[in-house]
């Protein structure tokens, strides 16, 4: 690719694995027939320097627009009530088959009015900073899932969100989101 153009990063060389042990199907997805490893990372290059921008599986695509979840999380974490590492963002399919952005924020505030104000403010910031309507939900402290290395797990948070709201009917969540957007 030309400088400044993003793409999926592939590697090949003597130190690159030849496959996953006893997992031929996973190996065939990760490695092509010429031995190139698909890292799952997206990046760009400028003057021979590679910059990794994020994981392909974490990328949020809304109406054909690529949005990095860490950009949304950074905006949320800039608010005084939100600590660094207390926000996670991902997308889910809505009842019309479109992708809907979700932002989960660990919140220590107990006052209902202050919590509601924070949700409204974060929603407005996503619209202002990113031109994006985002379903914001406050969750209890220390409730967001983490990986074995201690980082927030977007994939697990997404699965937990879907599982939690399936009983409530995920369609009701997307309808609530549409009503919030309409009243904003």
Put a short name on every predicted segment.
Residues 37-39, 139:
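Short, small/polar residue-rich loop motifs at catalytic or cofactor-binding pockets
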Residues 4, 45, 146-147:
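Short, acidic, Ser/Thr-enriched surface-loop or helix-capping motifs
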Residues 2-7, 16-18, 28, 32-34:
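Conserved ATP-binding loop and adjacent catalytic segment of the adenylate-forming AMP-binding
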Residues 9-11:
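A structural motif
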Residues 13, 18-19, 29, 40-130:
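AMP-binding/adenylate-forming catalytic core of the ANL superfamily
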Residues 90-91, 102-103, 123-183:
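Conserved C-terminal "lid"/linker of ANL adenylate-forming enzymes
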């Amino acid at each position: 690719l030309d400088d400044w153009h993003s793409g999926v990063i592939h590697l090949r060389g003597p130190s690159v694995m030849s496959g996953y042990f006893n997992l031929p199907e996973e190996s065939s997805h990760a490695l092509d027939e010429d031995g190139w490893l698909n890292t799952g990372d997206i990046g760009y290059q400028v003057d021979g320097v590679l910059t990794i921008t994020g994981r392909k599986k974490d990328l949020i695509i809304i109406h054909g627009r690529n949005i990095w979840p860490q950009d949304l999380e950074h905006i949320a974490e800039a608010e005084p009530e939100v600590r660094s590492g207390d926000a996670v963002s991902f997308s889910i399919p809505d009842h019309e088959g479109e992708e809907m952005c979700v932002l989960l924020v660990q919140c220590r505030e107990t006052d209902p009015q202050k919590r509601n104000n924070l949700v409204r403010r974060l929603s407005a910031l996503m619209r202002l900073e990113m031109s994006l309507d985002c379903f914001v939900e406050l969750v209890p402290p220390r409730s967001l899932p983490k990986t074995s290395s201690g980082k927030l797990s977007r994939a697990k948070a997404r699965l937990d969100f879907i599982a939690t709201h399936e009983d409530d009917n995920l369609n009701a969540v997307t309808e609530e989101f549409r009503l919030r957007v309409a009243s904003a």
